[in-house]
Structures are given as structure tokens and as C-alpha cells.
Amino acid sequence: MEITPARGGLNRAHLQCRNLQEFLGGLSPGVLDRLYGHPATCLAVFRELPSLAKNWVMRMLFLEQPLPQAAVALWVKKEFSKAQEESTGLLSGLRIWHTQLLPGGLQGLILNPVFRQNLRIALLGGGKAWSDDTSQLGPDKHARDVPSLDKYAEERWEVVLHFMVGSPSAAVSQDLAQLLSQAGLMKSTEPGEPPCITSAGFQFLLLDTPAQLWYFMLQYLQTAQSRGMDLVEILSFLFQLSFSTLGKDYSVEGMSDSLLNFLQHLREFGLVFQRKRKSRRYYPTRLAINLSSGVSGAGGTVHQPGFIVVETNYRLYAYTESELQIALIALFSEMLYRFPNMVVAQVTRESVQQAIASGITAQQIIHFLRTRAHPVMLKQNPVLPPTITDQIRLWELERDRLRFTEGVLYNQFLSQVDFELLLAHARELGVLVFENSAKRLMVVTPAGHSDVKRFWKRQKHSS
């Protein structure tokens, strides 16, 4: 008899991206208090607060004594009570302020002293320099200007995106490939096989670059401690990078080994340029400096001129030279012809169902075609031919008619008696999923597998 795990089911996770406040709110109080020990962190957090919360922080920034809660409540008109509740909860959740008992028993509010002190330093100047001076290293013989840094950052990040869509020319480190899998953006269908894109990964590719980077860095931070990294150290460094000057070099002197390792990962993502691994200076790119712009806009999609024409005969014409966009189209269509500035593809049942098998949904394919429709297509109402959108949905429904159940397959029984005996036991336990007496095979639930296996071993020993 042979026992085989039977796999099934589609994993179509919806991509959810937390903003900075939600991420910080999920950290422990001890980690938050340590984070506020750096002025760059305090300034970055302050910058992302709602207007009302910013106003409160500025009014209390130079107060050493707590204010009565009733007095703070009077700063806001009654019609803005909802905004007041949200800002109050946010400042408390981020430990920017806390309650303190006043003489006489009244409740008061006071800013977190560590946050208050370091935000003052960030706004007024003073304190320790955020990074070491590069003057001791002398002028950089291989200095990079802003256009070359922009080009480098774009190329490095595109390598990551090309790897996700399966471009053979794109190669990334094992750490990065593992992170993409842990984030649910890619998955391996079989051991040893190269990973392929998931439904969440396809949604990820539809985001704009700042939102992609923010989501990606969130996944990185969630696994940082398992890599032996100090979360506070690398978060503070990220915030520090966002206040860097584009085109200026910075020294790596004084960095810990953990931070130097993090710098190499940022180098691979395109957030910093470092000529060699052992180079003593680095240049933050625009991606690092604008990283926080993905915080509030993490759900945004790409806004670019449309280039796709879809015909009712399922032909697709894409007027683009972008290798990434062509690779994305190839995920759900069959490539027919390729010209210098245009590709022709065919949307087929097989190509769509292959994409669906990877976890990409029909709605995502339709959304991709609609958001990249050529201006000529935009003049139509609806933008995409209904025959195309309906058929893509039908192909998805056709595949989803089957209901998948995980189980363990038992087959290759030596006799019908053995099969009937084990079948009766599985049925008695209520763990039988499927049976075929003619072929002597049965499937049991993963939970019931151990009981059935033990019963079978006992029967073999007793016979």
C-alpha cells in the first residue's frame, strides 16, 4: 500500500498594506519608546500625523507639565468630535502622549518625554549628527549625480519585479527570493521548482513604485528579528535615509555589522547606491528618500498612459517597449508576435486558466486590461468588450466548479480484503473523503491520517 498527500485549493489572498501608524501601533511599548530615542524617527512619525494631532503636539511640545483633559477637549469644536476621537486614540496608541493624574484628582495629558525631547531636536537643530561626515574620506572619485542614481534605482527595482514575473534574465539573492515567498508574493508549486507569482504578487505589481517599496519594506521589517537584526536600529536608519539629501554621499563609519548587512539588502532593492560591498560611502537614492510617500498612498495603482487595445476576437495589442509590462501580459495570454514597439497576444482559455491556477483572479486580469487601456479604447463605453470580460469570468467559474479538499491517498492494496477493512475503519472514524473500490484507492483527511495509519500497522502485525 502507498500513502501520498493529496493537495488542493487555491490561495487567493487579498493584498493588505498597513500604513506607518498601523505598523507602529502594532509594536510593543518598549520598542516604541526605543524608537523615539532618535530625532529622525520622531520627525517621520510627526510628519504622518493628521492635522489635528499635529496641532496638539505642537501646542504641547514645550510644556513640561500635564494639561487637564477637559482643557485639551476645548481646543476642538463639537462638530469635529469624530476627528478628535481619532486623533486622541492615535496619539495614545503610538505612545506620543499619555495620561497623568493631576493634583486634585483630575486626569491630565502630557507628551512622552523622550518623543518631546527628540522632536524638539529635529525641529530646532542640535543634538548628535544623524550620520558620520565623509570629509575624512576625501572627495569621491566615482561620485554619482542625481540622474545616474535615479537610473540605478529604477534598474535595481525592476530586476525584483522581473524576477516576480519569471523573466529568465532576472536573478536575485536567496534572501530576497525567500522574502518574496514569505510575503506571499511568490510561491513554489513543487520542491526544487522556481517560484511563481501569486494573486497577491499580481496585485503588488499593479501598485505604484512607492507603494510597492513600502509594502515590501513592511514585510522585511516583520522578519527582521528572525534574521537576528535589531528592529529599532534598522527602522531608525530607514527614517534617517528619508531625510537624506539626494546626490550626497554618506559614510558607513560607526555602523554595526547588522546595519551593514541591512545596507547590502537596501543596495539590492535600489534604495542606496554603493559602488562596492566594502566601499566606505553610500548614496541614498530617490526611492529611499521618497519611501514615506508610499505610507499614505500604499493602495494606489500605477498611473500611466494606456497602451493596450483588446479586440472582440480575443486579440490583444500592446504598444509598449517595457519588458515588465510585456511579461505581465504574458502571464495570462499567449504571445504571437513581437515588434520593436508593439506585441500581439491572444487571450485563450488555456492561458487564462493557467494564470488562475497560479492564484491570479479574473477580476485582476480585467482590472489590468482596463487600467492600461489605450486612449482609443477609453472612448468606448464600456472600455473593454463585454464578450472579453464575460468570457474571462466564465473561464474562472469553469475552473472553480471543482471543490478542493486536502487529504492523504491510500492505494496499491495487496488484496480487496485489506482495502475493505481499512475503508470500514476510516468510514467509522468519519475521516473518509473519497473511495474507489474498483481501483482500491481511498482518501482520508489529514487529521485522520495518523489514526488510520496506526490501525493499519496494528492489522499488519496481527496478521
Curated annotation (Swiss-Prot):
Keywords: DNA damage, DNA repair, Nucleus, Transcription, Transcription regulation. It comes from the Eukaryota. Its main location: nucleus. One of its GO terms (biological process) is nucleotide-excision repair. GO terms for cellular component: core TFIIH complex portion of holo TFIIH complex; nuclear speck; nucleus; transcription factor TFIID complex; transcription factor TFIIH holo complex. It is found in: Nucleus. Pfam families: Tfb2 (PF03849), Tfb2_C (PF18307). GO terms for molecular function: ATPase activator activity; RNA polymerase II general transcription initiation factor activity. NCBIfam families: tfb2. Component of the 7-subunit TFIIH core complex composed of XPB/ERCC3, XPD/ERCC2, GTF2H1, GTF2H2, GTF2H3, GTF2H4 and GTF2H5, which is active in NER. The core complex associates with the 3-subunit CDK-activating kinase (CAK) module composed of CCNH/cyclin H, CDK7 and MNAT1 to form the 10-subunit holoenzyme (holo-TFIIH) active in transcription. Component of the general transcription and DNA repair factor IIH (TFIIH) core complex, which is involved in general and transcription-coupled nucleotide excision repair (NER) of damaged DNA and, when complexed to CAK, in RNA transcription by RNA polymerase II. In NER, TFIIH acts by opening DNA around the lesion to allow the excision of the damaged oligonucleotide and its replacement by a new DNA fragment. In transcription, TFIIH has an essential role in transcription initiation. PANTHER family: GENERAL TRANSCRIPTION FACTOR IIH SUBUNIT 4, TFIIH, POLYPEPTIDE 4. Belongs to the TFB2 family. This is General transcription factor IIH subunit 4. It comes from Mus musculus (Mouse). The lineage of its organism: Eukaryota, Metazoa, Chordata, Craniata, Vertebrata. The gene is Gtf2h4.
